[in-house]
């Protein structure tokens, strides 16, 4: 598996996806090697839950832009992975690339070693940007398109992404499959002093409204911030915003201009243990995304038995059933978000109903063991075609 992020480097949803998927694949007897980017303090090589992890130099010398840095990182990733493949007694069966950031290395390795390449497209640039407006965005789109067409098969995390990838890259349906993301329910079952931990974020009288995600436009946090006055007019609440990103300064100014600094806490990134606990003490988790290929934050809230308010968009629409496993609101609509949050906070019976239903859905559909089994079967389908063809080296 090739990915630019893997714990402790966690930028988005790919890192936890690989961490959990690799663990469960190992349990099924799959030998997993993960090649990823280095991170301060993390060892160059280690075994994590049975998966072999190799971290390659990310070229920390100054680069003119992120794309140049990524290209340099891919050069080293391809070189180090090639050395790894050559040093092993056994041949890798499949190369699994995760998103465009590792496309150059993945495609190069595919052709050098004649190993089938598959890719998980976690999101698309045209979806993230609501179109392609700059040369930089078009470059990313073209790289995604190249990776998609070089791959034997494509994995999408939702039916929504299946449709978007097919539309964006013109792929036939028989080269694509849907395997959802998952969540580890067990981490939300550890006991801790909830009252003591809660003091870090709110007073006993305040309800906790939680947002977790990158502070970028498509995640819709600006909609939630704008809805705060309407929510506070009916409920005494504290808004905890977990994550970082390019919009943090503007959001902080927005909160200051609204004179709500005492009601909004920007935590930045939190360690996994603190985030797990925060999900469990929150009274509601809000996922107000404008664009969302899947919505791992929604799954985490459901696994923690936290009532969920989510935008009716993208993959979220498949995860959340309105009035059953959560409350759906219109994306980008301040009044709708305020209504959804207020409804959950003012009706404890309703909140309890949706959170328990959501938890059961997680157990039935989004268990990592089931997802790993689907992934292994997907690999076996690819290998069956590969073994029957003429591309395999003799």
Please report, for each region that a protein language model flagged, where it lies by residue.
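Conserved acidic donor-binding segment of nucleotide-sugar-dependent glycosyltransferases
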Residues: 322-323, 327-334, 343-349
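A conserved nucleotide-sugar
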Residues: 203-213, 221-265, 273-274
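Carbohydrate-associated surface elements
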Residues: 38, 160, 182
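A short, well-ordered alpha-helix in the C-terminal region of glycosyltransferases
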Residues: 343, 350-364, 374-377
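Short hydrophobic beta-strand element within catalytic cores of glycosyltransferases
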Residues: 307-310, 320
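Short alpha-helical donor nucleotide-sugar binding micro-motif in glycosyltransferases
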Residues: 269-270, 277-282
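Aromatic "clamp/platform" in nucleotide-sugar-dependent glycosyltransferases that forms part
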Residues: 290
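N-terminal subdomain of nucleotide-sugar transferases
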Residues: 1-52, 387, 391-394
């Amino acid at each position: 598996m090739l990915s630019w992020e893997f714990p402790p480097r966690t930028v988005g949803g790919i890192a936890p996806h690989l961490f959990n998927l690799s663990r469960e694949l190992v349990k099924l007897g799959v030998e997993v090697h993960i090649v990823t980017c280095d991170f301060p303090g993390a060892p160059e090589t280690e075994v994590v839950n049975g998966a072999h992890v190799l971290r390659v130099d990310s070229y920390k010398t100054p680069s003119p832009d992120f794309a140049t840095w990524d290209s340099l990182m891919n050069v080293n990733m391809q070189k180090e992975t090639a050395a790894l493949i050559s040093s092993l007694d056994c041949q890798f069966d499949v190369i699994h690339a995760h998103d465009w950031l590792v496309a150059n290395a993945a495609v190069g390795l595919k052709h050098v070693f004649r190993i089938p390449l598959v890719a998980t497209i976690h999101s698309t640039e045209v979806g993230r940007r609501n179109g392609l407006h700059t040369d930089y965005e078009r470059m990313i789109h073209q790289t995604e398109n190249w990776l998609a067409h070089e791959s034997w098969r494509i994995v999408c995390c939702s039916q929504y992404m299946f449709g978007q990838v097919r539309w964006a890259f013109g792929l036939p349906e028989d080269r694509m499959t849907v395997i959802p993301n998952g969540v580890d329910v067990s981490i939300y079952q550890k006991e801790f002093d909830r009252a003591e931990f809660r003091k870090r974020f709110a007073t006993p009288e305040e309800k906790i409204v939680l947002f977790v995600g990158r502070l970028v436009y498509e995640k819709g946090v600006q909609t939630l911030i704008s809805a705060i006055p309407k929510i506070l007019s009916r409920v005494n609440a504290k808004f905890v915003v977990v994550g970082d990103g390019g919009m943090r300064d503007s959001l902080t100014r927005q909160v200051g201009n609204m004179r709500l600094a005492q009601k909004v806490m920007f935590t930045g990134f939190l360690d996994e243990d603190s985030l797990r606990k925060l999900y469990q003490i929150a009274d509601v988790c809000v996922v107000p995304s404008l664009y969302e290929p899947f919505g791992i934050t929604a799954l985490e809230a459901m696994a923690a038995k936290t009532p969920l308010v989510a935008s009716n968009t993208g993959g979220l629409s498949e995860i959340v059933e309105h009035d059953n496993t959560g409350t759906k609101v219109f994306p980008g609509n301040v009044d709708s978000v305020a209504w959804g949050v207020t409804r959950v906070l003012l009706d404890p019976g309703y909140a309890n109903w949706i959170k328990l239903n959501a938890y059961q859905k997680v157990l039935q559909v989004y268990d990592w063991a089931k997802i790993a089994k689907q992934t292994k079967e997907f690999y076996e389908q690819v290998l069956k075609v590969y073994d029957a063809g003429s591309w395999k080296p003799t």
